[in-house]
Swiss-Prot record:
Subunit record text: Homotrimer.
GO cellular component, one term: cytoplasm
Name of the protein in question: Acyl-[acyl-carrier-protein]--UDP-N-acetylglucosamine O-acyltransferase
Listed NCBIfam families: lipid_A_lpxA, PRK05289.1
Physiological role: Involved in the biosynthesis of lipid A, a phosphorylated glycolipid that anchors the lipopolysaccharide to the outer membrane of the cell.
Domain of life of the native organism: Bacteria
Length: 274
Protein backbone atom coordinates (compact mmCIF):
# COMPACT_ATOMS: atom_id res chain seq x y z
CA UNK A 1 0.00 0.00 0.00
CA UNK A 2 2.94 2.30 -0.63
CA UNK A 3 1.75 5.83 -1.34
CA UNK A 4 -1.88 5.03 -0.52
CA UNK A 5 -3.83 7.77 1.27
CA UNK A 6 -7.02 7.11 3.23
CA UNK A 7 -9.02 10.00 4.65
CA UNK A 8 -9.60 9.61 8.40
CA UNK A 9 -13.39 9.67 7.91
CA UNK A 10 -13.31 6.80 5.41
CA UNK A 11 -14.22 3.25 6.50
CA UNK A 12 -12.07 0.53 4.97
CA UNK A 13 -13.16 -2.83 6.34
CA UNK A 14 -10.58 -5.36 7.46
CA UNK A 15 -9.69 -7.66 4.59
CA UNK A 16 -10.09 -5.10 1.82
CA UNK A 17 -7.15 -5.14 -0.61
CA UNK A 18 -5.84 -1.75 -1.70
CA UNK A 19 -3.01 -1.39 -4.19
CA UNK A 20 -0.26 1.22 -4.27
CA UNK A 21 -0.91 4.95 -4.68
CA UNK A 22 -4.63 4.61 -4.01
CA UNK A 23 -6.59 7.63 -2.78
CA UNK A 24 -9.68 7.07 -0.62
CA UNK A 25 -11.58 10.28 0.03
CA UNK A 26 -13.82 11.44 2.89
CA UNK A 27 -16.70 9.24 4.03
CA UNK A 28 -15.99 6.40 1.61
CA UNK A 29 -16.94 2.85 2.62
CA UNK A 30 -15.00 -0.10 1.21
CA UNK A 31 -16.13 -3.66 1.94
CA UNK A 32 -13.91 -6.37 3.36
CA UNK A 33 -14.00 -8.29 0.05
CA UNK A 34 -13.19 -5.37 -2.23
CA UNK A 35 -10.02 -5.24 -4.33
CA UNK A 36 -8.87 -1.76 -5.41
CA UNK A 37 -6.11 -1.63 -8.02
CA UNK A 38 -2.99 0.53 -8.08
CA UNK A 39 -3.47 4.22 -8.72
CA UNK A 40 -7.22 4.31 -8.18
CA UNK A 41 -8.92 7.41 -6.78
CA UNK A 42 -12.17 7.33 -4.84
CA UNK A 43 -13.58 10.77 -4.21
CA UNK A 44 -15.88 11.49 -1.27
CA UNK A 45 -18.84 9.27 -0.28
CA UNK A 46 -18.03 6.38 -2.65
CA UNK A 47 -19.40 2.99 -1.54
CA UNK A 48 -17.76 -0.27 -2.67
CA UNK A 49 -19.84 -3.27 -1.61
CA UNK A 50 -19.34 -7.04 -1.62
CA UNK A 51 -16.84 -8.81 -3.85
CA UNK A 52 -16.04 -5.90 -6.16
CA UNK A 53 -12.79 -5.50 -8.07
CA UNK A 54 -11.78 -2.09 -9.41
CA UNK A 55 -8.99 -2.09 -12.00
CA UNK A 56 -5.86 0.04 -11.82
CA UNK A 57 -5.91 3.78 -12.50
CA UNK A 58 -9.69 4.06 -12.32
CA UNK A 59 -11.36 7.13 -10.85
CA UNK A 60 -14.69 7.03 -9.02
CA UNK A 61 -16.56 10.22 -8.18
CA UNK A 62 -18.81 11.11 -5.26
CA UNK A 63 -21.84 9.02 -4.32
CA UNK A 64 -21.18 6.23 -6.79
CA UNK A 65 -22.22 2.83 -5.39
CA UNK A 66 -20.46 -0.20 -6.84
CA UNK A 67 -21.24 -3.82 -6.06
CA UNK A 68 -24.64 -3.64 -4.37
CA UNK A 69 -26.85 -6.73 -4.42
CA UNK A 70 -28.80 -7.28 -7.63
CA UNK A 71 -32.36 -6.04 -8.02
CA UNK A 72 -33.57 -9.52 -8.90
CA UNK A 73 -36.33 -11.33 -7.01
CA UNK A 74 -34.74 -14.67 -7.91
CA UNK A 75 -31.49 -13.78 -6.16
CA UNK A 76 -31.17 -15.66 -2.85
CA UNK A 77 -28.19 -13.84 -1.39
CA UNK A 78 -25.48 -16.11 -2.78
CA UNK A 79 -21.87 -15.20 -3.51
CA UNK A 80 -21.68 -13.02 -6.63
CA UNK A 81 -19.20 -10.50 -8.01
CA UNK A 82 -18.63 -7.24 -9.87
CA UNK A 83 -15.43 -6.79 -11.87
CA UNK A 84 -14.47 -3.40 -13.33
CA UNK A 85 -11.47 -3.01 -15.63
CA UNK A 86 -8.57 -0.60 -15.54
CA UNK A 87 -8.56 3.10 -16.40
CA UNK A 88 -12.31 3.58 -16.04
CA UNK A 89 -13.96 6.87 -15.14
CA UNK A 90 -17.10 6.50 -13.04
CA UNK A 91 -18.88 9.76 -12.39
CA UNK A 92 -21.22 10.96 -9.65
CA UNK A 93 -24.10 8.73 -8.63
CA UNK A 94 -23.30 5.80 -10.91
CA UNK A 95 -24.58 2.41 -9.73
CA UNK A 96 -23.31 -1.03 -10.77
CA UNK A 97 -24.72 -4.22 -9.27
CA UNK A 98 -23.14 -7.60 -8.67
CA UNK A 99 -24.37 -10.64 -10.58
CA UNK A 100 -27.25 -12.78 -9.36
CA UNK A 101 -27.01 -16.34 -8.05
CA UNK A 102 -29.88 -17.35 -10.34
CA UNK A 103 -27.72 -16.53 -13.38
CA UNK A 104 -23.99 -16.32 -14.15
CA UNK A 105 -23.27 -14.54 -10.87
CA UNK A 106 -20.91 -12.00 -12.42
CA UNK A 107 -21.22 -8.45 -13.70
CA UNK A 108 -18.21 -7.57 -15.84
CA UNK A 109 -17.07 -4.15 -17.10
CA UNK A 110 -14.06 -3.76 -19.39
CA UNK A 111 -11.13 -1.35 -19.58
CA UNK A 112 -11.03 2.35 -20.53
CA UNK A 113 -14.74 2.95 -20.02
CA UNK A 114 -16.52 6.19 -19.16
CA UNK A 115 -19.77 6.26 -17.22
CA UNK A 116 -21.33 9.69 -16.82
CA UNK A 117 -23.49 10.80 -13.89
CA UNK A 118 -26.23 8.44 -12.67
CA UNK A 119 -25.65 5.71 -15.25
CA UNK A 120 -26.80 2.26 -14.08
CA UNK A 121 -25.50 -1.23 -14.90
CA UNK A 122 -27.69 -4.05 -13.61
CA UNK A 123 -26.84 -7.61 -12.57
CA UNK A 124 -25.08 -10.10 -14.85
CA UNK A 125 -24.26 -7.55 -17.55
CA UNK A 126 -21.13 -7.79 -19.66
CA UNK A 127 -19.78 -4.46 -20.86
CA UNK A 128 -16.81 -4.35 -23.22
CA UNK A 129 -13.79 -2.08 -23.48
CA UNK A 130 -13.75 1.62 -24.41
CA UNK A 131 -17.50 2.16 -24.01
CA UNK A 132 -19.15 5.45 -23.12
CA UNK A 133 -22.44 5.73 -21.24
CA UNK A 134 -23.78 9.29 -21.06
CA UNK A 135 -25.80 10.64 -18.13
CA UNK A 136 -28.70 8.54 -16.84
CA UNK A 137 -28.14 5.57 -19.17
CA UNK A 138 -29.86 2.47 -17.78
CA UNK A 139 -29.07 -1.08 -18.85
CA UNK A 140 -31.13 -3.90 -17.41
CA UNK A 141 -29.96 -7.33 -16.29
CA UNK A 142 -28.10 -9.76 -18.56
CA UNK A 143 -27.35 -7.12 -21.22
CA UNK A 144 -24.20 -7.54 -23.33
CA UNK A 145 -22.49 -4.40 -24.67
CA UNK A 146 -19.62 -4.73 -27.15
CA UNK A 147 -16.41 -2.72 -27.39
CA UNK A 148 -16.48 0.97 -28.38
CA UNK A 149 -20.24 1.33 -27.94
CA UNK A 150 -21.61 4.82 -27.20
CA UNK A 151 -25.00 5.24 -25.52
CA UNK A 152 -26.61 8.68 -25.37
CA UNK A 153 -28.06 10.29 -22.27
CA UNK A 154 -31.25 8.88 -20.79
CA UNK A 155 -31.29 5.79 -23.01
CA UNK A 156 -32.56 2.48 -21.66
CA UNK A 157 -31.70 -1.06 -22.75
CA UNK A 158 -34.07 -4.00 -22.11
CA UNK A 159 -32.86 -7.09 -20.25
CA UNK A 160 -31.03 -9.75 -22.29
CA UNK A 161 -30.44 -7.37 -25.22
CA UNK A 162 -27.11 -7.60 -27.06
CA UNK A 163 -25.43 -4.45 -28.39
CA UNK A 164 -22.77 -5.13 -31.02
CA UNK A 165 -19.35 -3.50 -31.00
CA UNK A 166 -19.01 0.06 -32.34
CA UNK A 167 -22.79 0.56 -32.17
CA UNK A 168 -24.44 3.85 -31.20
CA UNK A 169 -27.70 4.35 -29.29
CA UNK A 170 -29.24 7.81 -29.42
CA UNK A 171 -30.21 9.74 -26.32
CA UNK A 172 -33.58 9.01 -24.67
CA UNK A 173 -33.96 5.87 -26.79
CA UNK A 174 -35.42 2.61 -25.51
CA UNK A 175 -33.67 -0.37 -27.08
CA UNK A 176 -35.63 -3.61 -26.77
CA UNK A 177 -33.99 -5.70 -29.52
CA UNK A 178 -30.45 -6.78 -30.38
CA UNK A 179 -28.47 -4.06 -32.19
CA UNK A 180 -25.99 -5.25 -34.81
CA UNK A 181 -22.31 -4.23 -34.71
CA UNK A 182 -21.81 -0.72 -36.15
CA UNK A 183 -25.58 -0.12 -36.01
CA UNK A 184 -27.27 3.12 -34.95
CA UNK A 185 -30.54 2.93 -33.01
CA UNK A 186 -32.70 5.96 -32.23
CA UNK A 187 -36.22 6.64 -31.01
CA UNK A 188 -38.42 6.23 -27.97
CA UNK A 189 -39.02 2.73 -29.28
CA UNK A 190 -35.60 2.49 -30.89
CA UNK A 191 -35.30 1.33 -34.49
CA UNK A 192 -32.28 0.75 -36.67
CA UNK A 193 -31.66 4.11 -38.32
CA UNK A 194 -28.46 3.39 -40.19
CA UNK A 195 -24.81 2.68 -39.50
CA UNK A 196 -22.41 4.39 -37.12
CA UNK A 197 -20.19 5.78 -39.87
CA UNK A 198 -18.18 7.94 -37.46
CA UNK A 199 -17.51 4.92 -35.27
CA UNK A 200 -16.48 2.87 -38.29
CA UNK A 201 -14.00 5.52 -39.37
CA UNK A 202 -12.61 5.75 -35.85
CA UNK A 203 -12.18 1.97 -35.93
CA UNK A 204 -9.99 2.35 -39.02
CA UNK A 205 -12.36 0.76 -41.53
CA UNK A 206 -11.50 1.61 -45.11
CA UNK A 207 -14.01 3.15 -47.50
CA UNK A 208 -14.52 -0.17 -49.30
CA UNK A 209 -15.34 -1.88 -46.00
CA UNK A 210 -17.87 0.80 -45.10
CA UNK A 211 -19.59 0.50 -48.47
CA UNK A 212 -19.59 -3.30 -48.20
CA UNK A 213 -21.26 -3.16 -44.81
CA UNK A 214 -23.82 -0.62 -46.01
CA UNK A 215 -24.81 -2.90 -48.86
CA UNK A 216 -24.78 -6.00 -46.68
CA UNK A 217 -27.05 -4.48 -44.03
CA UNK A 218 -29.40 -3.15 -46.71
CA UNK A 219 -29.62 -6.71 -48.07
CA UNK A 220 -30.37 -8.06 -44.61
CA UNK A 221 -33.35 -5.80 -44.07
CA UNK A 222 -34.93 -5.49 -47.54
CA UNK A 223 -37.55 -8.18 -46.72
CA UNK A 224 -37.46 -9.69 -50.22
CA UNK A 225 -36.62 -13.17 -48.90
CA UNK A 226 -36.87 -15.11 -45.64
CA UNK A 227 -34.40 -13.74 -43.12
CA UNK A 228 -32.26 -16.90 -43.01
CA UNK A 229 -31.78 -16.72 -46.77
CA UNK A 230 -30.77 -13.08 -46.57
CA UNK A 231 -28.17 -13.88 -43.90
CA UNK A 232 -26.81 -16.69 -46.07
CA UNK A 233 -26.69 -14.45 -49.14
CA UNK A 234 -24.78 -11.74 -47.28
CA UNK A 235 -22.27 -14.26 -45.90
CA UNK A 236 -21.67 -15.62 -49.41
CA UNK A 237 -21.45 -12.20 -51.02
CA UNK A 238 -18.90 -10.68 -48.61
CA UNK A 239 -16.75 -13.52 -47.21
CA UNK A 240 -13.62 -11.33 -47.08
CA UNK A 241 -15.12 -8.30 -45.31
CA UNK A 242 -14.45 -8.57 -41.59
CA UNK A 243 -17.08 -5.99 -40.71
CA UNK A 244 -19.72 -7.96 -42.61
CA UNK A 245 -18.52 -11.20 -41.06
CA UNK A 246 -18.89 -9.59 -37.62
CA UNK A 247 -22.52 -8.71 -38.34
CA UNK A 248 -23.30 -12.17 -39.74
CA UNK A 249 -21.72 -13.88 -36.74
CA UNK A 250 -23.64 -11.59 -34.38
CA UNK A 251 -26.90 -12.63 -36.04
CA UNK A 252 -26.00 -16.32 -35.99
CA UNK A 253 -25.21 -16.11 -32.27
CA UNK A 254 -28.84 -15.32 -31.60
CA UNK A 255 -29.70 -14.30 -28.06
CA UNK A 256 -33.03 -14.20 -26.26
CA UNK A 257 -34.31 -11.02 -27.92
CA UNK A 258 -35.41 -10.18 -31.46
CA UNK A 259 -33.36 -7.82 -33.63
CA UNK A 260 -33.56 -4.06 -33.79
CA UNK A 261 -34.78 -3.41 -37.35
CA UNK A 262 -35.70 -0.41 -39.51
CA UNK A 263 -38.95 1.36 -38.70
CA UNK A 264 -41.24 0.12 -41.46
CA UNK A 265 -41.59 -3.16 -43.28
CA UNK A 266 -39.55 -2.89 -46.46
CA UNK A 267 -37.42 0.04 -45.29
CA UNK A 268 -33.79 -0.07 -46.27
CA UNK A 269 -30.77 1.10 -44.34
CA UNK A 270 -29.99 4.66 -45.35
CA UNK A 271 -27.20 4.95 -47.89
CA UNK A 272 -25.80 8.11 -46.28
CA UNK A 273 -22.88 9.86 -47.88
CA UNK A 274 -19.58 9.59 -46.07
Amino acid sequence: MSGTKIHPTALVEKGAQLGENVFVGPFCHISSEAVIGDGCSLMSHVVIMGKTTLGADSKVFSHAILGAEPQDNKHKGGYTTLSIGKNCTIREGVTMHRGSDSSVGMTIVGDNCQFFCYAHIAHDCRVGNNVTFANNVMIAGHVTVGDYVIIGGGAAVHQFVRVGHHAFIGGVSALVGDLIPYGTAVGVQAKLAGLNIIGMKRAGLERKDIHALRHAVAMLFDHSKPFKERVSDVASFYPASQSVVDVVNFIKEKGKRFYCTPKFEGDRIKENKD
